[in-house]
Each structure stands twice: as structure tokens, then as C-alpha cells.
Amino acid sequence: MYHIELKKEALLPRERLVDLGADRLSNQELLAILLRTGIKEKPVLEISTQILENISSLADFGQLSLQELQSIKGIGQVKSVEIKAMLELAKRIHKAEYDRKEQILSSEQLARKMMLELGDKKQEHLVAIYMDTQNRIIEQRTIFIGTVRRSVAEPREILHYACKNMATSLIIIHNHPSGSPKPSESDLSFTKKIKRSCDHLGIVCLDHIIVGKNKYYSFREEADIL
């Protein structure tokens, strides 16, 4: 049986969410907000508690049918449909989060993806890929867009988003509008600079990839500096 811990004090879920944040509310409080109202002889928190008491764990909540929900006094067709819609949306959000976190297995894999995105760009784009402990992408962020003559980005800007995303590793990618991925001296200098900054914060700089027209250069594959 799913364990419910009821509080003695009067609960005002909406006000508590505003004051404390959604993560501080109990499961029955969150469900009560979705249900909105109870019935004359049963407050909404009592209804939400009864729903949760009908399942062995929160993971089973999504398995409740419309008929099972409607068998609970205070839950009619409208509320049961709203609950099922909320559960389906939550499932789709979870799937979208998982799909977004593509796992990077090699520099070549990422380079091929980025050649499609940046290979034909007329301006230089500097992109950072932030990853978790399993090399799954947390965020892909364009740090800078500039001309061939001016494409400077400070490591602190790159690392700001690494810290914000709680990333454990990152890969830097930029394109050469000329189509040739051959690194320049400034590319080499920047790579060393970003690696030093990452090391200082305990973030792993896995690679710096330069993409051109159907070609790429990986500092990890070609140079002994990462």
C-alpha cells in the first residue's frame, strides 16, 4: 500500500506552492492542486489521499484507468480525464527529455552531426555541447556567432553554462567558413586555454572539433593536448 503521511495543520496547497515551490509539496498536495475542488462531504485533499492510497507506489499511478478513478467518490468523468491527460503529458515530457539527451560515443559521431549543422555557415559559429556523466547531451548552446576576422569567446562564458547545467564534461565545436578544418594558431591557443579553465573547475574538456565542408578536425584525435 502506498504510504501517505497526513499533516495535522490545515493544508493550503496552492499557497504553499507559491511560497515554497512545487518540490516542497507532498504528492497528495500536488494532486489536490490538479483536482482543484472536492465535494461537500469530502475535501479535495482527502480525495487526493484516497487516490494515492489505491496504489502500491507512485509509479503505478499512471496505470489507473478512467473507470478506477471515477470509482472514487468526488472524481467524475471530467476530473478523471484531466488526470489521465496530465499523466500522458508527463510521460511525453519524460520521453522528450530522454530523447534530447543523445549519448556521444565518439568525436566522429558528433563531428558528422555538426558538419550538417555548421558546414555551410558563412559566419563562424562557436558551439558548446554540455554532457552528463554518461556523455548524454544536456544542452547544445551556441556561444558565439561572428565574422571570419572576429570569433573570440572567453572560457568563462562557456563554463558559466557548464556550471548552470551541472555538466561533468563538454565539447567545443566551431566551423571554418572557408571549408577547411585545418586549425590555426589561435585555435590551438584557445583549445589550451579552455582546457586549463575546465581543469580548474573539475570539468572534462573532451574535445575541440573544427568542422568544414564535409571535413572535420578533432584535437583529441589529432593533437596531444586534450
Curated annotation (Swiss-Prot):
GO biological process: proteolysis
Domain MPN: start-end pairs: 103-225
Binding site for Zn(2+): 174, 176, 187
One Pfam family named in its UniProt record: UPF0758_N
Span(s) of short sequence motif JAMM motif: 174-187
Domain of life: Bacteria
Gene Ontology molecular function terms on file: metal ion binding; metallopeptidase activity
Family label: Belongs to the UPF0758 family.
Protein name: UPF0758 protein SAG1101
